[in-house]
Amino acid sequence: MMQLGGGTPTTTAAATTVTTATAPPPQSNNNDSAATEAAAAAVGAFEVSEEMHDRGFGGNRWPRQETLALLKIRSDMGIAFRDASVKGPLWEEVSRKMAEHGYIRNAKKCKEKFENVYKYHKRTKEGRTGKSEGKTYRFFDQLEALESQSTTSLHHHQQQTPLRPQQNNNNNNNNNNNSSIFSTPPPVTTVMPTLPSSSIPPYTQQINVPSFPNISGDFLSDNSTSSSSSYSTSSDMEMGGGTATTRKKRKRKWKVFFERLMKQVVDKQEELQRKFLEAVEKREHERLVREESWRVQEIARINREHEILAQERSMSAAKDAAVMAFLQKLSEKQPNQPQPQPQPQQVRPSMQLNNNNQQQPPQRSPPPQPPAPLPQPIQAVVSTLDTTKTDNGGDQNMTPAASASSSRWPKVEIEALIKLRTNLDSKYQENGPKGPLWEEISAGMRRLGFNRNSKRCKEKWENINKYFKKVKESNKKRPEDSKTCPYFHQLDALYRERNKFHSNNNIAASSSSSGLVKPDNSVPLMVQPEQQWPPAVTTATTTPAAAQPDQQSQPSEQNFDDEEGTDEEYDDEDEEEENEEEEGGEFELVPSNNNNNKTTNNL
């Protein structure tokens, strides 16, 4: 007992004396149980509050026999629990004894179960469980006996020595009850006749040192009241003796708890949502500010680019206007410049001979001509060809803008070219190069809104005239609504007037020089290169009209765009025509009969 209780030797001796001499053992156990309960409530309250977290609500239910065995073991060890300051080893002993009875429970579970049973007993006794009577708890008898034994033992220690026999009788009755309940052996009733005088003071001192009855009642009442809300649920669930009112209270507590928990969760969610919305609004505002600043910068950049483009366009327009004004001044000054001197007279006979060969085929041999040396006409032909090539290849100073213009000419532009060329035809009939003529035509086209230089105008004129020549020389009859050569009527009218003029000049020149008469069935003048020289007296005769080019191109039946073709096709045709002219396919020089007669006479 000294090892379990941990008390002083004097106290142990006094307790032994009281137990063996004056009080029966069951009564001392009951008194010790009350004191031990008060000490357990005082010392282990903090431990219980911490261990409830690990145990949780509910737990494993204890059978009735196991609970009764726990109460019996705890009642037997009441003195040890009363004297011990550390209760851990004592509960380990309780757990070991429970294992001996066949119940496997650790010290912690045993301690918790005893505390819950005792607290529920106090509540039922005080009427705080809502029951009609306090004696409805199934362990009420055992706990009440334990409590009554503790109270009786304490009162016995407080009374005087003469009253001990009466206490013994009462204790005997109580012991009988306890023996019937706990199945304990009967107490020892032997009373010592004399007691040492020294044993009484320690006994009295042992009784007066702890004031456990008052402490246990007050402390346990306060402790059970303060912690009833935290332990009521677990004790009710373990005991299972609650009524409908208890269940309602328990449900009400759970409802309040969950409502408070849900309110906290909802408040937290609302706070998080509010912060989230504030962050989203802040980011949206920042994005709008960035977009607005970017939009302002873009507008400023576009305005700057527009201003720069407007300045460039104005500068380009000013430059173009200055260039146009300069070109107009040059075009106005060029026709007034003095005309260059005509070529030597020996070139004219060959040119006139070429025109006569194209206009009329000879029907009869020409009249005798005065003798003339042969090398002179040949030289004239060569010089004429060279001059023609030089004039056709002239105007080499072509501007890049003109070369970049489109190769295809619209119908309106071609009609404007024909009109300008027709109007200026009479002005440039005199001898001289045709460069000023095409410069003036180019200036006129530019005034009409067509950007074509002199070389392009000249090439286009030659191409459409060549195509007109092919259509004219074809044997097929051209219908009135034909789509080929849409400028046929304009060019035909132009050349009819020109043929009349040239025919009159040729007749006058031939009659004055050689007395030749123009035949009636003369062929109209076909188009020739632009370098045409005035008619002159020649000694050469033309070949029959049968000396035509071997290859004749048929008129095209394509549409307007296909009829005109590109400039490259026309350039190929120019080369073919020049090759034919150089080969002398259209005319040849033949010595006259007069020269032959004179040679014969000389011989």
Curated annotation (Swiss-Prot):
Alphabetical list of InterPro entries matching this protein: Myb_DNA-bind_4, SANT/Myb
Ranges of compositional bias, category Acidic residues: 559-586
Localization of this protein: Nucleus
GO MF, one example: DNA-binding transcription factor activity
Compositionally biased residues, Polar residues: 381-408
One GO CC annotation: nucleus
Keywords attached to this entry: DNA-binding, Nucleus, Repeat, Repressor, Transcription, Transcription regulation
Deletion phenotype: No visible phenotype under normal growth conditions, but the double mutant seedlings gtl1-1 and df1-1 exhibit increased root hair length. Reduced amount of seed coat mucilage.
Highest taxon of the lineage: Eukaryota
Pfam families: Myb_DNA-bind_4 (PF13837)
Region (Disordered): 149-201, 220-249, 333-408, 532-603
Ranges of biased composition (kind: Low complexity): 168-178, 189-198, 221-236, 344-362, 532-555, 593-603
Residue ranges occupied by any Myb-like domain in the UniProt entry: 60-118, 401-465
Keyword Transcription: yes
Gene Ontology biological process terms in this record: glucosinolate metabolic process; mucilage biosynthetic process; regulation of DNA-templated transcription
Location (main, coarse): nucleus
Ranges of compositional bias, category Pro residues: 363-376
Note: Plants overexpressing DF1 exhibit very short root hairs.
Task of the protein: Transcription repressor that negatively regulates root hair growth by directly binding RSL4 promoter and repressing RSL4 expression. Required for the synthesis of seed coat mucilage.
Protein name, per record: Trihelix transcription factor DF1
Organism: Arabidopsis thaliana (Mouse-ear cress)
Lineage: Eukaryota, Viridiplantae, Streptophyta, Embryophyta, Tracheophyta
Gene: DF1
